[in-house]
């Protein structure tokens, strides 16, 4: 069965046992090259063993995230795991609402502390986490079935579509290599700030 519901900020895909929901697709606004507004995407993944959030976006998106969860009869207290693709503020500000979650990130990230576990310790047979550095040295991406949530390895659709490294990066060469790695996966890409790029566009 395939059920797809799309509207302004939410979409949901159920394909057999696949459950992934984009709670918020993200936004990135620049004026004259200066970032004026940045809120990351936030993705819910439900596996047999865990309710997982990948990135929690900014505080002003809290109600959108909670509403998206409620549509599946979930609340923040039902989330077992939060995986942060990196630790920039626009990807982590709602972490505190997930009171029962264990938080995972890369120890290479500036800001990694005792609130986080090393992502390599996370175990779920349905999830693979890979390193995709460039935007930051510790950037990671989360693979689930036919989807990969990439954070700011590809903040916007054109980054992955046209193989353009993100403007904000610590190492442009690493960023490009990460984009190549993501393309080779041949999966639907959930970007950091602009929703989804379907794999058919990446062939």
Curated annotation (Swiss-Prot):
Keyword match Hydrolase: yes
Matching InterPro entries: Metallo-B-lactamas, NDM-1-like, RibonucZ/Hydroxyglut_hydro
Cofactor note: Binds 2 Zn(2+) ions per subunit.
EC number: 3.-.-.-
Molecular-function GO terms, alphabetical: hydrolase activity; metal ion binding
Binding, Zn(2+) 2: 90-91, 152, 193
Cofactor(s) needed for function: Zn(2+)
Keyword Nucleus recorded: no
Keywords, ordered alphabetically: Hydrolase, Metal-binding, Zinc
Family statement: Belongs to the metallo-beta-lactamase superfamily.
Protein name: Probable metallo-hydrolase MJ0296
Native species: Methanocaldococcus jannaschii (strain ATCC 43067 / DSM 2661 / JAL-1 / JCM 10045 / NBRC 100440)
